Amino acid sequence: MSKTIVRKNESIDDALRRFKRAVSKTGTLQEVRKREFYEKPSVRRKKKSEAARKRKH
């Protein structure tokens, strides 16, 4: 979990920008979106295989 402490004389916008950058860097939001709905292992393998095929070509 990302934690951002607002510094002295720092605007909320700057703190929010730092928080968003930290969340993006750790991949938290992508992980949440990925786990929003259950995905069967067979579907997960199929997607992984298709992604590898796309990278190759």
Curated annotation (Swiss-Prot):
Q: Which GO terms describe its cellular component?
A: ribonucleoprotein complex; ribosome
Q: Does the keyword Membrane apply?
A: no
InterPro entries (UniProt xref)? Ribosomal_bS21, Ribosomal_bS21_CS, Ribosomal_bS21_sf
**Keywords tagged on the record:** Ribonucleoprotein, Ribosomal protein
Q: Which GO terms describe its molecular function?
A: structural constituent of ribosome
Q: Which domain of life is it from?
A: Bacteria
Task: Note the Pfam families from the entry.
Answer: Ribosomal_S21
The processes (GO biological process) annotated in the record are:
translation
Record HAMAP family: Ribosomal_bS21 (MF_00358)
Per the similarity annotation, which family is this? Belongs to the bacterial ribosomal protein bS21 family.
NCBIfam families named among the record's database cross-references: S21p
> What protein name applies here?
Small ribosomal subunit protein bS21
